[in-house]
């Protein structure tokens, strides 16, 4: 990338519309990182992904599950999901939303 993109506020991210069939809208993408924003992600297990990813809670609460445990999460909390590992959300509040950051090479 040859320039720094402008900041993306939470309000601006919430205004983005995800593509058909997706619950997450693209915020930024380049060769090494892909950032998406998801308001009310799908409940239950997520499909394992081919890249490592971080989730950062923007608002609300949910239960986050991964292959070896579960915990309640809220604003400011961050979760890591290694490529190809089972993970997901349930029991989320109506205002639950997360930043999704895929990074690094596909594995």
Feature annotation, model-predicted:
Residues 31, 65-69, 92:
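Short strand-coil-strand connectors
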Residues 35-37, 64, 98:
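Short hydrophobic/aromatic-rich beta-strand segments that constitute the beta-sheet cores
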């Amino acid at each position: 990338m040859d320039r720094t993109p402008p900041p993306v506020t939470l309000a601006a991210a919430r205004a983005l519309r995800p593509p058909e069939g997706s619950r997450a809208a693209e915020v930024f993408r380049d060769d090494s990182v892909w950032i998406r924003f998801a308001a009310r992600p799908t409940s239950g297990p997520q499909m394992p992904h081919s890249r490592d990813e971080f989730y950062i809670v923007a608002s609300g609460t949910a239960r986050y599950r991964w292959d070896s445990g579960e915990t309640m999460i809220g604003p400011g909390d961050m979760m890591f999901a290694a490529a190809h590992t089972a993970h997901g959300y349930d029991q989320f509040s109506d205002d639950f939303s997360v930043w999704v950051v895929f990074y690094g090479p596909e594995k």
